[in-house]
Amino acid sequence: MVLVHVGYLVLPVFGSVRNRGAPFQRSQHPHATSCRHFHLGPPQPQQLAPDFPLAHPVQSQPGLSAHMAPAHQHSGTLHQSLTPLPTLQFQDVTGPSFLPQALHQQYLLQQQLLEAQHRRLVSHPRRNQDRVSVHPHRLHPSFDFGHQLQTPQPRYLAEGTDWDLSVDAGLSPAQFQVRPIPQHYQHYLATPRMHHFPRNSSSTQMVVHEIRNYPYPQLHFLALQGLNPSRHTSAVRESYEELLQLEDRLGNVTRGAVQNTIERFTFPHKYKKRRPQDSKGKKDEGEESDTDEKCTICLSMLEDGEDVRRLPCMHLFHQLCVDQWLAMSKKCPICRVDIETQLGADS
């Protein structure tokens, strides 16, 4: 057994060591995996030095067996002194199986974190495609445990939102291309109808849950569509049409009085103009006197012999004018007293 000093770590190496005076050299094996192999010995293509077994803990790689077989056939004496070894930078290397217990537990913790991150990315394939293309090195394991342990992502990133893609990837807003709007959102833009919007809490929660996974630029586009004045004008027009249809279904609600009620509670007669006394003097023709009366509905002066109607409140109107008014409302146009209420109070 040889103790290899790697930075501040002391790693045991089992097996024979050839060319003990040769420097510690690193070479990369052309496997499809991200593992790197370390050889002890001079850089000779014919000789094979013992390698670290870098296969994954569960499955074995057949490409490593042929490469590792000659390493176990060498035997020799272990020497007590070793030449100083340069400090190696371990990056993207999985932990060997012969690590001490503390490092082995740390290695297992890293594997669990990587598996959890992989499951989270697989559960959201849309985010997985974008992120793997931009950061392909995130899924590679690393031997530098102190820097590889990643902090948990915020909740809004773990739930599948996509508006952090341009920031994560370092892209400018011009480079971040907006994807086409899905078909199930087209009807919100094509036909601005008020009945398309949800009116209860359950449907609102469903729409909010779907829009939460919606990209930010397209949400901005939806907000701009909501600021279009034509949409609000159309909504107001349709709301007024709905009120007209409701009025047709309910019918005309009449709050006026029928003709029999009008005749019963009012006093119709022929108007006779009051004459002023001669002692007070005569006024010029065309000038109104204090005794002249006016119909406040048509704003015309009352003339002698016209058909008038006096209400219980003693206000006087033209008969035709006040009959049309009382057919819509039973209250006096001036004092707003109901003709039936006034009669009942006096009696």
UniProtKB/Swiss-Prot annotation:
Activation and inhibition: Binds free ubiquitin non-covalently via its RING-type zinc finger. Ubiquitin-binding leads to enhance the E3 ubiquitin-protein ligase activity by stabilizing the ubiquitin-conjugating enzyme E2 (donor ubiquitin) in the 'closed' conformation and activating ubiquitin transfer.
EC annotation from Swiss-Prot or TrEMBL: 2.3.2.27
GO molecular function terms listed in the Swiss-Prot or TrEMBL record: ubiquitin protein ligase activity; zinc ion binding
Recorded phenotype for the gene knockout or disruption: Around 10% of mice die at birth. While surviving pups are the same size as their littermates at birth, they fail to thrive and grow, reaching only 50% of the size of their siblings at postnatal day 15. They die before weaning during the first 3 postnatal weeks. Null pups display relaxed forepaws and reduced dorsiflexion. Hind limb defects are also observed. Defects are caused by inefficient growth of motor axons to distant muscles.
Keyword Cell wall biogenesis/degradation applies: no
Signal sequence extent: none
Residues the record lists as binding Zn(2+): C295, C298, H318, C321
Record SMART domains: RING, RINGv
One cellular component term from this protein's GO annotations in UniProt: nucleus
Matching InterPro entries: MBR1/2-like, Znf_RING, Znf_RING-CH, Znf_RING/FYVE/PHD
Ranges for region Ubiquitin binding: 267-269, 310-314
Localization: Nucleus
Stated name of the protein: E3 ubiquitin-protein ligase ARK2C
Organism, as annotated: Mus musculus
Taxonomic classification: Eukaryota, Metazoa, Chordata, Craniata, Vertebrata
